[in-house]
Amino acid sequence: MTAASLALADRDGFLKALDGSQRITKPYRHWLMKDILPLDQAEALHALPVPAPSGLTFSGRRETNNVTRFYFNAEAHEKFPATRALAEAFQDPKTIASIEKECGIDLTGTSLRLEFCQDTDGFWLEPHTDIGVKQYTMLIYLSKGKGSEDWGTDVYDQDLKWTHRAPCHFNSGLIFIPGTDTWHAVDPRPISGVRKSIIINYVAPEWRARHELAYPETPVT
């Protein structure tokens, strides 16, 4: 397949998954999806030859290990066709329009940010809402192996009471629109192997770390 056809396949796979998503309103609006990407593309992203970070400090916050984080930016796109295809799919105007309609948001002027996460045993995240500069948050779960279906995101209510855990089957995912009540976490649990996921954000123009962006000079229009 050509680069363009890979991107279109990713786009159409996501749009189908979004249309068939499970829409949940409590404790805040979020969407659960399955079969998000074409299976071969999901497998290619899972198999990216990027070593999982080691020697990390687990503090409940990703920023503690900022120097080891991996983004689907211009450098990654030159090396890995699968990352380029995913970025093009989520920069596509049809994708943007569908997200805006489904989620009731306006992404004009935002920039696409995609992070490839490879979490190992000991990793956890404290309850947080996502910072305000993030206008959209989505996770694609790409884990395999024993127990990986239980490695999903934990959802909390505004009183920080646990409500449920997103299913974490391979190529499934979660969407929410960050707000003051969108508390979520990754509670401590055994991770046998590597917990792989992709975090997709559209971030506001004031985002400073431009190297993290898929297209730092091309905001959504």
Language-model segment annotations:
Residues 78-91, 95-217:
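Catalytic core of non-heme Fe(II) oxygenases with the double-stranded beta-helix
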Residues 3, 9-13, 17-102:
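Non-heme Fe(II)/2-oxoglutarate
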Residues 1-6, 211-221:
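Intrinsically disordered terminal extensions flanking catalytic oxygenase cores
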